[in-house]
Amino acid sequence: MSENYVAPGQQRYLRACMVCSIVMTYARFRDEGCPNCEDFLHLQGSPDQIDSCTSQVFEGIITIANPQKSWVAKWQRLDGYVKGVYATKVSGQLPDDVRTTLEDDGIQYIPRDGSATEAD
């Protein structure tokens, strides 16, 4: 997990994806995109999209080494995502056009800010 290491002076550049809640630096989102959501968010190389779909305001950090076997990953709805560092709560709202794209692609968006719960 050394690829997720953030130097002490770099924490202020951390952002969390509003869809999957992975936490990375702004530069990593810019250079690599979101490892879970890039197919539909298109963050790589797009500062406007990064600003719209990630947030600097998040709470709690958990590290998931094996998302398929972790009960914490299941509890946080992270099973199926890549291993990494995730926020437990991400503040902010996705733009309407991004939400529409998710719906059109058949992806159920559940806000990570605690404002909605998963429908059973």
UniProtKB/Swiss-Prot annotation:
It is found in: Nucleus; Chromosome, Centromere. Keywords: Centromere, Chromosome, Metal-binding, mRNA processing, Nucleus, Transcription, Zinc, Zinc-finger. Pfam families: Spt4. CDD domains: Spt4. GO terms for molecular function: RNA polymerase II complex binding; zinc ion binding. A zinc finger (C4-type) spans 17-37. SUPFAM superfamilies: RNA polymerase subunits. Component of the spt4-spt5 complex. Interacts with RNA polymerase II. This is Transcription elongation factor spt4. The lineage of its organism: Eukaryota, Fungi, Dikarya, Ascomycota, Pezizomycotina. The gene is trf-2.
